Amino acid sequence: MSRRSRWAARSALAGVLLTLAAANTGGQTPTGIRDWDDGVKYARGQSVVPVFEGWVPNPDGTYSLVFGFWNRNWEETVYLPIGPENRIEPGGPDRGQPTVFTPRRGKNLFEIVVPKDFGNKEIVWTLTTRGKTEKAYGALVNQEVLTRRMVMAGGSLTAAAAAGNDDVGNESDPNKPPSITIDPVQPLTAPAPVTLTAAVSDDGVGAPPGATTRKTMRVVWSLYRAPTAAAFERSGNENDAQLAPTGGKATTMLRFKAPGTYVIRATATDVGGLATNKDVTVVVR
């Protein structure tokens, strides 16, 4: 496929995803997503598709290419280590991408900063699942420009973002994203569990008029990188959602089945819908 054809295809895909995101400002999964492939819900056995979400112009003149994924499975989490089956080029194979792909959609998960003179070059993310190869092409296409606020809102179109207002915390939308910190974790031996605590704070400002506002702040713990499955003890899954962190802290416990290096992500989302990610690395012997 030529570069021009790829750009046209990506633009069409971005338009569909943006429409779905706009329909999803209430936090519910849009009907269109459930029928994304062929109307059949596959529990497992399907591929994972890398997604180029768009790009954000940075104040220093550089650009941030934003990526996510689409796991076609409804129940199966797919693990793809960095390497031939999960690689980004040029500059890879490791450019900070996830290796854990939970069911369905993972939005705005990581960014790759490219220089001012990036021009019409491309960053290509390749995923191969069960012999099926899918690619995402990151490029500075006009139709795929995002704002920083849209990225923090997970693609939801708040009133400020829809108006092109990207000055976080300004007078028309004073809401600032939450801050989050996680203490480092000492190496441990499997199958010993680890307790993780995120300290979270927020300004308490809600969303602008006409936008979605949640009642409480939420913290979601998730596996971002892992060599194999590991489960949060409260949920039994690869993620653990918590509402209204007690005393500004969200604590979870994770038990590992095998040695390796794990990256656990905490995502804090405030009442106005803005989110902040923080990762912590755990080495399991």
Predicted regions and their residues:
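Proline-centered linker/hinge motifs at extracellular inter-domain junctions
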Residues: 48, 144-184
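Short, solvent-exposed loop/turn segments at the edges of extracellular beta-sandwich modules
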Residues: 269-274
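Residue-level recognition of secondary-structure-to-loop junctions
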Residues: 57, 251-258
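Low-complexity "stalk/linker" and mucin-like segments enriched in Ser/Thr/Pro/Ala/Gly
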Residues: 98, 212-252
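Short tyrosine-centred short linear motifs in exposed loops/low-complexity segments
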Residues: 61, 116-121, 191-192, 258-262
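C-terminal edge beta-strand
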Residues: 277-284
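Acidic, Ser/Thr
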Residues: 198-212, 222-224
